[in-house]
């Protein structure tokens, strides 16, 4: 019996380009959706741009355009990238749509009527220059606990303390630099704790990934909190009904964007929207997401749906991050690759295959090893799969006018290939794509061994062996057809070219139907080898792209610094006070971003006779920390080690500037050595 399913991908933020990290999720979901279609299931695949929030509002203002213009351009770019990678969405929409506004407003009113919306007056920092309330991330100042400077408004990344933005010492607006004032404002909260029982039951259902279920248990033990779903004007988003100058927080209307995109599809095609979203729906709902947004999709989203008497997701499938050559994607190394850059140089099917060969059902990071990428694509797709067709097709075309034999040369081998159909299907269904690829390639090896053993090039030279030659080559092509059918969800473009050659549609139902006595088209090249020079071209273009961006940012940084008022000189100290500081020259051995922190870089420093680890809050100023390797810095060497949230920091690196992106490391003339004392 055919299943009815709705599948979504997380909504890309309309404030930046699609990169290969995004593509992992969309390729994973697309393979799963294409497989379900091949199995005859009724499935709909939708997505949208996440188009609201303060960052979009500020970026648009910076560019001198409206937020609507910004998100329109982003959507066009995103759609082109996904089309380039053959992501087969049935609909791609935007959260800044009439459908989303209507559904968001309706759900809010339902939650309010059911008693799940609370309100209370809170105190917030307000930028008097920009005339706007400041979200926590747009307030910076000195930590009230450890006195570390340039900390965000909700937590210190040096001592890991949490606090209110009002507790910051010398707070300033990260937008204008102005000193904020305190103003009161009424905010609206979603009563998440009310849904703890339902969420626990949903967690125990056994359908969620074990990693998600375990993480949810940790959140339950920590205690669920009411969720602030409102933001004050100015804000780019939907206004809250009956609340002047209040807007829905972006994370409220973002997941509702799944519903809005599907509603847009339903309105265009006549599908029954309610059938998929009503509380007792018998359809299936799946969300593919990254591990960084599990919190919203496993707590807030199902609770909101339940509070509105709607169905909950059947499952939430989370995946890990993409690394390149074992490390985080890097702009300076050219591995922070945008989808559009990749598509200029490399066939998208290459990446689809490589990701599929490594994807499993767990929440694990996937490493794109560039050397392995080239080797695996050429070995599996070109040398094994496509070569299987080409080495047999030439004989069929030249000697038999494209006509295949009337019967199978090796029925047992064909039956062995067909027998793996349900196992391969199970691997696809369970998102164990790596296992499916491994099994398919094992069959591909057997198919090539069959051809090697039969040696049609030898048979072709023997008198009176035409029937045997036709049978062997037809068998090779038949096995290629089966393999291509299994790989169609992963390689849709190659499958389309194979269908043109075989003159038949590749479906799961007809896998076991051999092409006996039928004609195939003249063979044309199906796939090109992946060359290292193509990888190099992508890397170099990526480096150039971000070098140009950094140059422009550096120019703006200098201009901003020149226009910044000089801070007043601090109170006088004695020479004895200064003598207490032991300043040393240190050489940077390694430097990397702390993934869990918005601010910290982790340095390994050489001080001549020993090494130290130092955590420094200069991440915003140095987007490419690996470029600092080999550089000399000045550090306070006799500062007591400090145990921080992300490790122990054994000193302090000196820098100048007002904070955030306006920080500059101090350096010295040539000839200095690690460990030299600064006097």
Swiss-Prot record:
Catalytic activity: tRNA(Met) + L-methionine + ATP = L-methionyl-tRNA(Met) + AMP + diphosphate
Localization, UniProt: Cytoplasm
Cofactor(s) annotated in UniProt: Zn(2+)
One GO term (biological process): methionyl-tRNA aminoacylation
Domain tRNA-binding: 577-679
Signal peptide: none
UniProt short sequence motif 'KMSKS' region, positions renumbered to this chain: 328-332
Binding site residues for Zn(2+): 143, 146, 156, 159
Cofactor binding description: Binds 1 zinc ion per subunit.
SUPFAM superfamilies: Anticodon-binding domain of a subclass of class I aminoacyl-tRNA synthetases, Methionyl-tRNA synthetase (MetRS), Zn-domain, Nucleic acid-binding proteins, Nucleotidylyl transferase
Enzyme Commission identifier(s): 6.1.1.10
UniProt KW keywords: Aminoacyl-tRNA synthetase, ATP-binding, Cytoplasm, Ligase, Metal-binding, Nucleotide-binding, Protein biosynthesis, RNA-binding, tRNA-binding, Zinc
Cited InterPro entries: aa-tRNA-synth_I_CS, Anticodon_Met, Met-tRNA-synth_bsu_C, Met-tRNA_ligase_1, Met-tRNA_synth, Methionyl/Leucyl_tRNA_Synth, MetRS_core, MetRS_Zn
Motif ('HIGH' region): 12-22
Protein residues bound to ATP: 331
First-listed, main subcellular location of the protein, grouped into a coarse class: cytoplasm
A single GO cellular-component term on record: cytosol
GO molecular function annotation: ATP binding; metal ion binding; methionine-tRNA ligase activity; tRNA binding
Subunit structure: Homodimer.
Function according to Swiss-Prot or TrEMBL: Is required not only for elongation of protein synthesis but also for the initiation of all mRNA translation through initiator tRNA(fMet) aminoacylation.
Family: Belongs to the class-I aminoacyl-tRNA synthetase family. MetG type 1 subfamily.
Protein name: Methionine--tRNA ligase
UniProt source species: Actinobacillus pleuropneumoniae serotype 5b (strain L20)
